C-alpha cells in the first residue's frame, strides 16, 4: 500500500467527544497491528486532536474542505463507524459528483446507498411501516405555518426533530402552540435542509436502548439492553440509566430484542447498531425512536458495562471479519458471537455543571459527563456510583438544606440530580403515591429508592467484600488477562493477585474527555518500564489498557481492599493539579 493510501476513520463532533475518543483508540489499536490507520476529524482542533496529532487529521465540516483533504489520500478506504448524519450529507454530495470513483476511494462497511435508505427520520418511518412496526403520526414541514396545520389534527405534546441537525440539536417537545412555533422556527434554522419532522410524542413512555452487533455474513447477537429511569422526553445522556434492562416482562424484552435484530438485518448494517425504543407502560405497544449505526454514548456505556470494547469489535466487523471467527475479546476459548448474559447491574448517574443546576431537563443535553457503579443489585450499583460523586465532590446541590416546596419543584420540573431530591423527600416521609405523581417515575424505580432509604435507617449489615470480573457470561467462562473488576459487598473474591504491581489511580476530572489520553500514556509509560499496571478508574474507554482494571470509587477504602488482594509495589496518582 502506498504511503498516502490509508484506512481513514471518518469522525465528527459528538457528546463528550465519544466518537473522537473511540476513533483515536481504535486507530491506535489498528496501527499496533500495522493497520496504517488515520482519524479524519471534521471539526475544530481540541485537546484530543492535539494529544493524538500523529494519527489525527483535522478538517472543516465543509464540502470543499473534505474534498481537498480526501484528495491527499487517493486510493484509501473510508470507515464510517464514527461518522454522523452531517458527515453523511457531505459524503452523499461527493458521491453524486463521482468523486469517490475518480479518487479511487472505497467505503468499507455499509455502502452510502445503504445509509441513504434511512438517512432521514421520514425514511426510517417508511422502513418501520414496511416491517409492520407502529410509528407515531407525523409530518415533514418546511415552515411554521405547515407545523400549525399539522398540529390541528393531532394532540399535544408534539415532538420536533430538525432534519440531520448536529448532535440532535434543536430537538424539542412542544406542549402547546406557542412551544411549537418557537421550536419549529429554531429547528428550521439548525437543519441543513431547513426541514423538521413533527410527530406524535411518546412523552412519558419508558425509554430503552438495545445494541446489536452484526457482521456481513448475517451473524449477530444482542450486546446490551439499556434502560433509562427517566421517561421519553429527557435526553438519554441526562437520564439515570442501567444495564441490563431488568424491569421488562419476558414478552416485552423478547419483542424489543426481536425488533432490534430484525431492523439491523433488514437494513443490512454491520458493526455496532443502537436502536432506541419507546415502550408504552400500559400495554405491550412500542415505537422505534431511532436507529443509530454510529458511535454513541449508548455503545460507550455498553462497552464499559460488558468489560470489552464494542467499538473495536464493530470496526473489525466493518472491515469484513466474522463474529464466528473472531475470538471473544474477554472470554477464554469462545468466539465473538457469544451473546452476553450479565449477573450484575451497571448504573450511570449523569453529572451537571453549576450553570445547569436550574435547567429543566428535556430533549437537549445538559450534562457534561457521568459516573458509573456496578453491583449485584440496582441499589448496590447506584450506591457505588453515588460514592464516586461524593469522593469527587461532584454534587454541588444540597437537598437536605431545601424546603419541602423547593424539593417538590425540583422533582416535578425534572431538574438535574432529581433522584437526590426524591431520596430526600422519602427521608422526610413524603407519601409514595405523591412522589409517583410528582416524578412520573415507574413504581419499580421509586421502590428502589425507598429501599435505599430503609437500608440507611436500618442496622448496618455484616458484609464480605469481594471483587468480581466485569464479564458477559455470568461466571460460566474463564476471563482473559486484563479484565476489569468491580466490588460487591457480599461474595467470593475472584480477582487473583498480581505480584509487584504498580497501582495507577485515575483521579482526573471527569468533564474533560481528553484526560483519557493522559491515562493511556501513563499506562504505556509504566509498562515500558516493565511494570505490571493495575488501573483504578471510573472512566469509559479504559478496557484492556492495563494488566488489570478496577472500576471503583477512588478513596482510601478502595485502595486498602486492592492491597489486600494484590502485592502493590507503588501507587501513582493522576490528578488535576499535575
Where in this protein do the model-derived segments appear?
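Phosphate-coordination loops involved in phosphoryl transfer and adenosine-cofactor binding
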Residues: 4-5, 104, 110, 193, ...
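A short helix->loop->beta-strand "cap" motif at the edges of active sites that frequently abuts
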Residues: 35, 102-105, 528-531
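A conserved helix-loop-beta module that forms one wall/lid of the active-site cleft
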Residues: 48-55, 106-170
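Conserved N-proximal alpha/beta basic substrate-recognition cap immediately N-terminal to
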Residues: 63-135
Amino acid at each position: 500500500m502506498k504511503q498516502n493510501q490509508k484506512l481513514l476513520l471518518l469522525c465528527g463532533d459528538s457528546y463528550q467527544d465519544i466518537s473522537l475518543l473511540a476513533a483515536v483508540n481504535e486507530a491506535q489499536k489498528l496501527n499496533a497491528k500495522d493497520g496504517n490507520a488515520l482519524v479524519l476529524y471534521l471539526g475544530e482542533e481540541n485537546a484530543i486532536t492535539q494529544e493524538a496529532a500523529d494519527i489525527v487529521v483535522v478538517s472543516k465540516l465543509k464540502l470543499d474542505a473534505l474534498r481537498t483533504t480526501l484528495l491527499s489520500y487517493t486510493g484509501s478506504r473510508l470507515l464510517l463507524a464514527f461518522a454522523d448524519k452531517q458527515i453523511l450529507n457531505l459524503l452523499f454530495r461527493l458521491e453524486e459528483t463521482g468523486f469517490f470513483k475518480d479518487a479511487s476511494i472505497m467505503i468499507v462497511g455499509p455502502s452510502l446507498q445503504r445509509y441513504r435508505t434511512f438517512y432521514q427520520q421520514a425514511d426510517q418511518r417508511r422502513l418501520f411501516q414496511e416491517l409492520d412496526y407502529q410509528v407515531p403520526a407525523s409530518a415533514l414541514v418546511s415552515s411554521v405555518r405547515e407545523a400549525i396545520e399539522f398540529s390541528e389534527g393531532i394532540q399535544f405534546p408534539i415532538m420536533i426533530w430538525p432534519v440531520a441537525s448536529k448532535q440532535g440539536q434543536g430537538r424539542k417537545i412542544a406542549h402547546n402552540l406557542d412551544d411549537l412555533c418557537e421550536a419549529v422556527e429554531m429547528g428550521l434554522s439548525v437543519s441543513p435542509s431547513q426541514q423538521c419532522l413533527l410527530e406524535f410524542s411518546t412523552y412519558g413512555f419508558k425509554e430503552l436502548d438495545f445494541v446489536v452487533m452484526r457482521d456481513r455474513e448475517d451473524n449477530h447477537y444482542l450486546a446490551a439492553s439499556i434502560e433509562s429511569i427517566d421517561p421519553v422526553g429527557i435526553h438519554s445522556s441526562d437520564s439515570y440509566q442501567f444495564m441490563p434492562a431488568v424491569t421488562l416482562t419476558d414478552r416485552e424484552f423478547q419483542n424489543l430484542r426481536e425488533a432490534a435484530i430484525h431492523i439491523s438485518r433488514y437494513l443490512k448494517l454491520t458493526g455496532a447498531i443502537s436502536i432506541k425504543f419507546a415502550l408504552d407502560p400500559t400495554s405491550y405497544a412500542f415505537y422505534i425512536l431511532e436507529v443509530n449505526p454510529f458511535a454513541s454514548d449508548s455503545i460507550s456505556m455498553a462497552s464499559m458495562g460488558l468489560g470489552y470494547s464494542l467499538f473495536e469489535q464493530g470496526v473489525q466487523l466493518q472491515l469484513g471479519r466474522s463474529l464466528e471467527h473472531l475470538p471473544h475479546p474477554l472470554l477464554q476459548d469462545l468466539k465473538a458471537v457469544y451473546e452476553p448474559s450479565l449477573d450484575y447491574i451497571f448504573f450511570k448517574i449523569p453529572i451537571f455543571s453549576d450553570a445547569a443546576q436550574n435547567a429543566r431537563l428535556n430533549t437537549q443535553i445538559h450534562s457534561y459527563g457521568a459516573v458509573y457503579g456496578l453491583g449485584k443489585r440496582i441499589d448496590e450499583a447506584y450506591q457505588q456510583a453515588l460514592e464516586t460523586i461524593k469522593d469527587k465532590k461532584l454534587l454541588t446541590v444540597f437537598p437536605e438544606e431545601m424546603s419541602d416546596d423547593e424539593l417538590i419543584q425540583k422533582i416535578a420540573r425534572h431538574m438535574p440530580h432529581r433522584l437526590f431530591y426524591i431520596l430526600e423527600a422519602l427521608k422526610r416521609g413524603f407519601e409514595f403515591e405523591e412522589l409517583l405523581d410528582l416524578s412520573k417515575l415507574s413504581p419499580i424505580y421509586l421502590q428502589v429508592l425507598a429501599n435505599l432509604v430503609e437500608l440507611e435507617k436500618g442496622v448496618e449489615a455484616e458484609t464480605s467484600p469481594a471483587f468480581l470480573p466485569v464479564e458477559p457470561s455470568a461466571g460460566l467462562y474463564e476471563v482473559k488477562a486484563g479484565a476489569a473488576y468491580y466490588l460487591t459487598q457480599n461474595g467470593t473474591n475472584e480477582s487473583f493477585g498480581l505480584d509487584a504491581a504498580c497501582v495507577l489511580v485515575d483521579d482526573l476530572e471527569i468533564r474533560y474527555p481528553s484526560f483519557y489520553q493522559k491515562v493511556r500514556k501513563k499506562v504505556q509509560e509504566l509498562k515500558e518500564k516493565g511494570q505490571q499496571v493495575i488501573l483504578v478508574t471510573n472512566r469509559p474507554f479504559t478496557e484492556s489498557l492495563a494488566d488489570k482494571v478496577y472500576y471503583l470509587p477512588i478513596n482510601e477504602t478502595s485502595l486498602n481492599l486492592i492491597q489486600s488482594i494484590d502485592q502493590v509495589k507503588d501507587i501513582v496518582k493522576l490528578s488535576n493539579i499535575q
